[in-house]
Amino acid sequence: MVQRWLYSTNAKDIAVLYFMLAIFSGMAGTAMSLIIRLELAAPGSQYLHGNSQLFNVLVVGHAVLMIFCAPFRLIYHCIEVLIDKHISVYSINENFTVSFWFWLLVVTYMVFRYVNHMAYPVGANSTGTMACHKSAGVKQPAQGKNCPMARLTNSCKECLGFSLTPSHLGIVIHAYVLEEEVHELTKNESLALSKSWHLEGCTSSNGKLRNTGLSERGNPGDNGVFMVPKFNLNKVRYFSTLSKLNARKEDSLAYLTKINTTDFSELNKLMENNHNKTETINTRILKLMSDIRMLLIAYNKIKSKKGNMSKGSNNITLDGINISYLNKLSKDINTNMFKFSPVRRVEIPKTSGGFRPLSVGNPREKIVQESMRMMLEIIYNNSFSYYSHGFRPNLSCLTAIIQCKNYMQYCNWFIKVDLNKCFDTIPHNMLINVLNERIKDKGFMDLLYKLLRAGYVDKNNNYHNTTLGIPQGSVVSPILCNIFLDKLDKYLENKFENEFNTGNMSNRGRNPIYNSLSSKIYRCKLLSEKLKLIRLRDHYQRNMGSDKSFKRAYFVRYADDIIIGVMGSHNDCKNILNDINNFLKENLGMSINMDKSVIKHSKEGVSFLGYDVKVTPWEKRPYRMIKKGDNFIRVRHHTSLVVNAPIRSIVMKLNKHGYCSHGILGKPRGVGRLIHEEMKTILMHYLAVGRGIMNYYRLATNFTTLRGRITYILFYSCCLTLARKFKLNTVKKVILKFGKVLVDPHSKVSFSIDDFKIRHKMNMTDSNYTPDEILDRYKYMLPRSLSLFSGICQICGSKHDLEVHHVRTLNNAANKIKDDYLLGRMIKMNRKQITICKTCHFKVHQGKYNGPGL
């Protein structure tokens, strides 16, 4: 049988064998095509795990099978059947084996002659390469538009009207096309281009001109080749995106003068398109966020934050940044050459036990993240739910507590929803799908995908991939979490308003026990019996707590903390919790931690954002007597929601940090780590601790009790610390020396109880701001950002090569001012950044600078 099929000279046998080979080639090529489509279905490596060589083999193998093997064998089969004769290149009697190897040699020669497939390094932001044409071509500069990636699998897009692969757009540096096709292109586009321009660079490079990276998903390669197919010539760009390759380096001051600080027309258009609109499709986001002005504003926002002087995985901070770096950063983002480095993963203890992973990113990359965050905030903030308060402008934990007080005072059940590892379990593909609903900018989405897949480095310096979740601690993570969980907010709004809430407040059912006791009181003749019945009735509400004809539910969310107030039954609460869990699993790929999520009666209360939230029991509510006819009746007041500060927990935290002892008793004690500081520093430290606690809990119902307890602990702890510092032994001697308010004789700083008086009034400003408000804010911030780079060196007066010197903190100690001249000058100016030239900056870090004499 084998000899018949492999060595037969019968035309019919060979035709059948060719037909079988054509079918097999078509099936194998289709399978390869499906694998390629799945791999390119989304940004980043999908199923091949970054194996670029395997991807190249699949692309070339698919091309060979679908272009050569399948159609050639099928055509040969038809010829054999029609003429019933074996046709061979060498002889009519030549067998199949010779013919097979002949065609294989032809295919192999064409692959090596016309196809060049290269393997690139695989990393966190790399997806491998593709087969690229290597023919001699001409250089055509590219700028301003997106080019489709040239693949052997999508050459039918323009001629057939559909593509065999997803449309992936990217940014390239140079496109290479055949000379005759360039003539056709320039003729169609009415561009007058000289012959010398077409042939530029072809002679020196033998026609094999290369760019610096692939356009595919914005991942840079190593000297990759990009070939534009003839069908897609009308989409080639005309100007170079990297003008710095052929341009001399500009002086920083000359560049700064070209920055327009007043024209924000594109940004204004983006704001107006998204102001109170939830279905706007946004494009060109990457170009806007990579604008040097937006990067300057982003830098101005993050430059003074303490965490931005913490080193990431590459030990680079904001120190030494200059306008040239921001200019290069802008170009790298715009050309998709920018990559996020892995974050440094640290673990911090949680109050409930265990550890929370925290990501420490590269401070300079936070400039890019802040610019991304500003774009996302402009697009999404006005469409967020009214009940969402986390990480939004003009909103905070306190506004969330106020909303609880306004809406949940009549609820009889509270549901505390605990999302299971919220930040760490957000699926990347679902997050990308949510963003794609309103953002149609592949460059921006690729940049975001690079951030999500950048990975992290643990404490042992081992690299780990990230395929799930968003890094806690990054600048853009909070708003990404809000965007993702906004689906949950909209679901709860729709469920409560359209499905759960029923009935009218005026038609609420009366409590039968209350009505029965009221009737007995009315019929009772003895005063003593009547008083007993009245006291018994006080334990019951007039209206039914769980009335099937009247139900209400409200929720408030701050990031991943959710509280739901329910006017209904306990079974209603269970159903709501199960419905939320099912929605999260089916639509967001998340779940609820059922062990930590609780359903409690409103009298018991739950903990939300550090407050103990509960409702005053009916029998403890105050009442007043009103006259009704000839009789007086007693009417209960409607009290507001009780939001107490957990005083015991706060005292335990002070105990943990050394301000008191004896657990919840809170016996004050001195803090040994402060005795070597100045008296002014000690007083300001205690005042800062007290103000921080009072400021956060200023809405607490038990604020007066809290203030008295905390003031007592901090005041006497401060006295004991000063007693140890000045060796006065007792608190009495400290008060006799410094007075009842502990006045520092030099700075006149005192420990006054009046400093802990916090206003209870809260400014409930609407989070939905207008485009004019944002523009005014940016127009104010941009000149301040430019002033850091457009001044003079504060040491030598130079105007060139200016950099920004950063310090972590400003220490007011006199010895620092004396020992370090530059730091002392920054302390006097009250600035954590100062502009100096590159030469002076080098001397500062080498320890060779100690005054203006240098």
UniProtKB/Swiss-Prot annotation:
**Database matches in CDD domains:** HNHc, RT_G2_intron
Q: Name one GO cellular component term.
A: membrane
| This protein's UniProt keywords | Mitochondrion
Matching Pfam families: AI2M-like_HNH, Intron_maturas2, RVT_1
Q: Could you tell me which residue ranges the Reverse transcriptase domain spans?
A: 329-613
Q: Can the keyword Mitochondrion be found in this entry's annotation?
A: yes
Report which superkingdom the organism of origin falls in: Eukaryota
What are the disulphide bonds in this sequence?
none
Location comes to: Mitochondrion
The molecular function terms in GO held by this entry are:
cytochrome-c oxidase activity; heme binding; RNA-directed DNA polymerase activity
Instruction: Specify whether NADP is a keyword of the entry.
Output: no
Tell me which PROSITE patterns the record gives.
COX1 (PS50855), RT_POL (PS50878)
Q: Which SMART domains match?
A: HNHc
UniProt GO BP: aerobic respiration; homing of group II introns; intron homing; mRNA processing
The entry's other comment says: This protein is coded in group-II intron 2 of OXI3 (COX1).
Q: What is this protein's name? A: Putative COX1/OXI3 intron 2 protein
Upper classification of the source organism reads: Eukaryota, Fungi, Dikarya, Ascomycota, Saccharomycotina
Q: Which gene encodes it?
A: AI2
